UniProtKB/Swiss-Prot annotation:
PROSITE patterns in alphabetical order: KRAB, SCAN_BOX, ZINC_FINGER_C2H2_1, ZINC_FINGER_C2H2_2
Phylogenetic lineage: Eukaryota, Metazoa, Chordata, Craniata, Vertebrata
The protein's name: Zinc finger protein 287
CC annotations in GO: nucleus
GO molecular function annotation: DNA-binding transcription factor activity, RNA polymerase II-specific; RNA polymerase II cis-regulatory region sequence-specific DNA binding; zinc ion binding
Ranges where the KRAB domain occurs: 170-238
Amino acid sequence: MLASSKRMNSSSRSQILLRWKSDKAQSGPYNVEKEILTSRFLRDTETCRQNFRNFPYPDLAGPRKALSQLRELCLKWLRPEIHSKEQILELLVLEQFLTILPGEVRTWVKSQYPESSEEAVTLVEDLTQILEEEAPQNSTLSQDTPEEDPRGKHAFQTGWLNDLVTKESMTFKDVAVDITQEDWELMRPVQKELYKTVTLQNYWNMVSLGLTVYRPTVIPILEEPWMVIKEILEGPSPEWETKAQACTPVEDMSKLTKEETHTIKLEDSYDYDDRLERRGKGGFWKIHTDERGFSLKSVLSQEYDPTEECLSKYDIYRNNFEKHSNLIVQFDTQLDNKTSVYNEGRATFNHVSYGIVHRKILPGEKPYKCNVCGKKFRKYPSLLKHQSTHAKEKSYECEECGKEFRHISSLIAHQRMHTGEKPYECHQCGKAFSQRAHLTIHQRIHTGEKPYKCDDCGKDFSQRAHLTIHQRTHTGEKPYKCLECGKTFSHSSSLINHQRVHTGEKPYICNECGKTFSQSTHLLQHQKIHTGKKPYKCNECWKVFSQSTYLIRHQRIHSGEKCYKCNECGKAFAHSSTLIQHQTTHTGEKSYICNICGKAFSQSANLTQHHRTHTGEKPYKCSVCGKAFSQSVHLTQHQRIHNGEKPFKCNICGKAYRQGANLTQHQRIHTGEKPYKCNECGKAFIYSSSLNQHQRTHTGERPYKCNECDKDFSQRTCLIQHQRIHTGEKPYACRICGKTFTQSTNLIQHQRVHTGAKHRN
């Protein structure tokens, strides 16, 4: 219990408990308004659902027609034209979950407007936790508790939901919202209007759960009050369960008005064991209810007092009517027969919100008006649906920062940002989260579950957001636009990263060397240089990499996949960066310029490498011999000298090489290809370096100079070999006798002494 109490702070707990208790009390105008505002199932949605759920089999129409009608009803309810498959599935699961909840819990959970089944589960769990914590307190405060339950306190902690289930056999009367006359007078107009809607919503909720076996009289009264008048005129309807009875005549009202009409209040009482009574020709109608709160029974069923004047009697009734309801119906007292036509000229149907509705609605007419914003509607269900938008206004405020939320569950999740509370822990790795939804997403890493599938390419994703982002690759949608340069992006994160190009912001700092980066991913990649961590391993050759992108690129060597194709020449490449580099050969674009010497490059990486020739920076160091390099690829190539790795193998002769470029050059020996041609003499070469060296014979250029003796060379390799004279370095050692040499050619000649091979002239 101590562990569970840490999961939720006292503020969240008190808010949920207060709401739970106030919802159960159902007393006072505040509770009535909350009951109405938090009603989830509106009449129009429930009507579509009930039409589908309760569709009877038409014997005369036949099975094919029945199936067609059933399909049409289902489409009206689920609306697949605006809902995805996942949303429809979530709707069905949420509906069934709310259905199986105990009555009081279901009412409270619905009042929180859960948008998903996961959110509904969280609400039930949080409520369960609070009620379990409240149970021991209530038991200690109670002084007149009978004999202690032999099951102990644990009986409530584990069985309170079951106790509610045992009380599930409720009637429409059990969910009625009753208020007193004093409460009614204290309510604001908007509260009174919303109070009326709760009857219809409660009724449809009961029907959806299969708990209502007949349609109470008050339902058609509220849905179509002009039909009630018609029912009064034409006689009782078995469908409404009305019962016509003789009633003791009330004082003759004809004296009260020249037009022989009188007023009847169709009581907005929410007790549903109603009986509609009639006194006969020219008589008065009244609705009897089992009196709860206030009702017409307390107004109209009084004995006639002959000592009171008729006008006084009428004034009493009239005042009571206006106190208790906004629904006043006048109808002609001259009922010569049951089929007499209602006198529209004299009749008025005065409803504060809905205007005149006793007659047929004309085209373009909108008789139903919202008292909150004044918007008008043609249909009553549309008004109910609209009023729910006011009901869903944010009402839960964070005491720390003042932010408001529509759902209390959202407030609870938000407050954990302030407290740092992370109650949801992964049993696999121990990682904790502030929200259950985040834990669910995280657990898919362990299970490998990817429930969201792209309909275009079939690719699966673990998160819906990832699927949405992926689908933009098919649609080409780029909704995020840079205000500086107009460039658009498919991801908001890409836009944020791009904007740092304009601002120069580099918020991510390496704690080891102080280097800054514009993107967090670049910092993470950089930090692996310090740690030497390489968590990504190739299953083919067991080579390890520091980044997942490097592993993906490497795996294309084994698969031979070349998924990036040039639209100009059709050439395919294994890496997107290689394609981008290649495309510059068509455009000739060199947008990256060195600020020191003005040299231009087609790639930013080439510019970065070039800068190091000015700065002398060599950040890549060999851990074996300590030699440093300006480029990571040079370090990788150098390390193969120590480990002897030669991953690039010729498919024709089987010869292996440390570098892919060397293999490419070698394969030209088999093909005879010499792609590099001298423009001066027409001589062709296999290697570009050979062409560069050859061209210096025409130009006389000797760009490589020794710092010791100022001697010039046309080739870098010649300079390196020369510098070993000054340093005395002999890097080439014979593995048999250990003798060292300054040049590799000298080592090769020496090794023939051991092998007996003769040099070929």
